[in-house]
Amino acid sequence: SITYPLKSIKVTSPYGYRCDPINGRKSMHHGIDLQAHNEYVYSMMDGKVEKVGYDARSGNYIILRHADFTISYCHLSKVHLAPETPVFAGTIIGKSGSTGRATGEHLHIVTKHKGIIFNPKILFCYVKSHQK
C-alpha cells in the first residue's frame, strides 16, 4: 500500500533546476518541497526506519527504507521514530518544520531507487492513480 506524506499536497518547489531561494544561484533541487505548517508527516509505504538525524542542510530528517527504495523526509520539527522501527503506509513519522537550510516551514522529500535519486513526482502520480 502507498499514501501521500501529508493530508493534502501542494508542491511549492518541484524537482529539477531552479534559482536557489537562499543564494540566488541556479542549482539542482534533488527533491520536492511541499507546503506544510506544523503538520503530521506520514510514511508513504511499508518499510522501516533506516536513519534519523540532523544536518545543516536537511535539518531534522528521517530516512525510511522500502525494499529497493528510500524516502528522506527533511526539515522536520520533530521525528517520532527510532532507527529500525517498522512502519506502514500512513504511520506518523514526524511533524513538519523549518529546521536546517530552509526559508520557511515545509516538507522536503527525496526519493531514491537502488541509491539513485529520482523525481518524487513519479511516486505521487502512482499514489494518485491508486487511491480508492
Where would I find each of the regions flagged by the language model?
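Surface-exposed, glycine-biased beta-strand/turn segments
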Residues: 1-60, 89
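Residue-level detector of conserved, well-ordered beta-strand and adjacent loop positions
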Residues: 12, 35, 65, 74-77, ...
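Residue-level recognition of beta-strand microenvironments
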Residues: 14, 52-53, 79, 96-99
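A short local loop/turn or secondary-structure capping micro-motif enriched for an aromatic residue
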Residues: 20-21, 51, 59-60, 72, ...
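Structural recognition of the beta-strand scaffold that forms the well-ordered cores
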Residues: 33-35, 41-43, 63, 72-74, ...
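Short histidine-centered loop motifs in beta-beta connectors
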Residues: 42, 52, 66-90, 114
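Conserved, short, structured surface segments that act as functional micro-motifs
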Residues: 60-66, 85-132
